[in-house]
């Protein structure tokens, strides 16, 4: 049985004080979430400690926005699994299109991050997705398959989440058609060779389209960017209604 994972990625937003204001508003909404939905927030690293304290005793889990493959060392600007575990972090996003784009992260590095997360008890959320140029050239499936096969090598597929995020839909207001997103998620599950693989969709997810997205048979959750920055909007997404 595949579980439902609804994750909000705050990216480089929210100070500790604004994060506290957000959580104070969000927690009352969270009491209405169905018990079988795993709701996750990925704040910036500076706010993790604050949220860890505020979320104690709630049904909301923490994720980091990245994790390094070494536990200590001369890796400026990185964060290790043990640093995250100290603050009750449960998930770690790896391979998001922004680090891939701005810091030239390779599939091999993303695989190292995912394996490090798993070996330390974190659940990696491994992001994959194509650019608009790759899609227009008919390369989308080849690109995503490579990301899946290289990114998941030597990982435990029972203890990770895949997030399909077409790059052209992230922060643009353009959403991949639900049927097409569902088709790609089905292919990802096929390429991975594991029918119970948990797969999210990400890319301009918002309250107006969440019910349709979550009605798709091969989509198990969402990775939300901009819409997760508003507590009421993210609560509506987490409390989606099945069609």
Swiss-Prot record:
Family the UniProt entry places it in: Belongs to the triosephosphate isomerase family.
Cysteine pairs bridged by disulfides in the record: none
Assembly behavior: Homodimer.
Pathway(s) this gene product operates in, as recorded in its UniProt entry: Carbohydrate biosynthesis; gluconeogenesis; Carbohydrate degradation; glycolysis; D-glyceraldehyde 3-phosphate from glycerone phosphate: step 1/1
GO cellular component, one term: cytosol
Record bears the keyword Phosphoprotein: no
First-listed, main subcellular location of the protein, grouped into a coarse class: cytoplasm
Residues annotated to bind substrate: 9-11, 171, 204, 225-226
Active-site positions on this chain: 96, 165
Protein name from the UniProt record: Triosephosphate isomerase
Listed CDD domains: TIM
Single GO MF descriptor: triose-phosphate isomerase activity
GO biological process: gluconeogenesis; glyceraldehyde-3-phosphate biosynthetic process; glycerol catabolic process; glycolytic process
Keywords on record: Cytoplasm, Gluconeogenesis, Glycolysis, Isomerase
Enzyme class: isomerase
